[in-house]
Amino acid sequence: MIRVLVVEDMPTARQLLVGILSADPELEVVGQASDGAEALALVRALRPDAITMDVMMMPVDGIQATAQIMAERPTPIVIVTSLDVNEVTLSMKALAAGALAALPKPRGPGSPGFADDARRLVTTVKAMSRVALLRRPEPARAAAPPPAAPPDVPRGRVVAVAASTGGPAALQRILARLPAALPAPLLVVQHIALGFAEGFARWLASAGPLPARVARDGLLLEPGVVHVAPDDRHLGVSADGTRATVTDAAPVGGFRPSGTPLFRSVAAAYGAGAVGVILSGMGRDGVEGLADLRRAGGRVVAQEAASCAVDGMPGAARAAGLADAVLAPDAIADRLALWLRR
């Protein structure tokens, strides 16, 4: 039985979440909290296996509560919030503080999408409760020293990133350390719930010196700009590498967006000028695409296991022998800046 703590300040929404979770035979709601301070006390007393957490609460909000829980007793946290763009942006801050996933609040019973929302909530809570490696957010640390003689860098360059569970925190660390004059566009596939892409892009834009936007089909790719895959769409680049492509092609390995189409696309367009980065996440999405990128002469950076919330995707890339470098997020940023410098 998976023991769940529900944290939500609105009684009606809290009752809805409790009802959905309690209806599943594998889940038991062991406690309910109406703010972050109460949540922390119940985590200490009940030691739940998973937590659903709202972000907009008083006096202690979900971001503060997540940070305190991850520092004191790391527990899988699923953020459940409204799709208001400001709340979505706050949800990203909670992910950076250590939460593993973010979902929109379920629609009420009788709504056409209620069954799908309930199923998604239950499935996500179960999956996150099984995450074996949970780490509190790391303090900043010195980057690994760069190689003495970096390889030559081609003129046309691009950085493609794939991430899932635990990825937002790592990506934030990377973007905060990159130079504003990055001489390449940066494309990001992040597995995230529907409705969260715009808030995710806004949050990334606040994480460092690089502007970030949700990509659209045909968008001109600009150096020093982060281009984020839209909700439920694959992201790639045009054959000449100048524009974004956004498609609703079938999911790859169950994911849309997926890292594999992105990596394959930049491999075909940029060849040796492509750099693939694979960050924390469950499963092995992106690994097949990284193999194509390596065959095209590109380079691959995989996040090290010790700094991952979940070492599935980068671990699979390392196991396949695809990583040219295995680094913590801060060091990934420094290595990218080195490889891409003019």
Swiss-Prot record:
Gene3D superfamilies in alphabetical order: 3.40.50.2300, Methylesterase CheB, C-terminal domain
Post-translational modification: Phosphorylated by CheA. Phosphorylation of the N-terminal regulatory domain activates the methylesterase activity.
The Response regulatory domain, residue ranges: 3-120
Domain CheB-type methylesterase: residue ranges: 152-342
GO cellular component labels: cytoplasm
Localization of this protein: Cytoplasm
Residues of the active site: S164, H191, D285
Reaction it catalyzes: [protein]-L-glutamate 5-O-methyl ester + H2O = L-glutamyl-[protein] + methanol + H(+); L-glutaminyl-[protein] + H2O = L-glutamyl-[protein] + NH4(+)
EC number(s) reported in the record: 3.1.1.61, 3.5.1.44
Record-linked InterPro entries: CheB-like, CheB_C, CheY-like_superfamily, Sig_transdc_resp-reg_Me-estase, Sig_transdc_resp-reg_receiver
GO biological process: chemotaxis
NCBIfam families: PRK00742.1 (NF001965)
Role of this protein: Involved in chemotaxis. Part of a chemotaxis signal transduction system that modulates chemotaxis in response to various stimuli. Catalyzes the demethylation of specific methylglutamate residues introduced into the chemoreceptors (methyl-accepting chemotaxis proteins or MCP) by CheR. Also mediates the irreversible deamidation of specific glutamine residues to glutamic acid.
Family: Belongs to the CheB family.
Domain notes: Contains a C-terminal catalytic domain, and an N-terminal region which modulates catalytic activity.
UniProt-recorded name of the protein: Protein-glutamate methylesterase/protein-glutamine glutaminase 3
Organism whose genome encodes this protein: Anaeromyxobacter dehalogenans (strain 2CP-C)
Gene behind the chain: cheB3
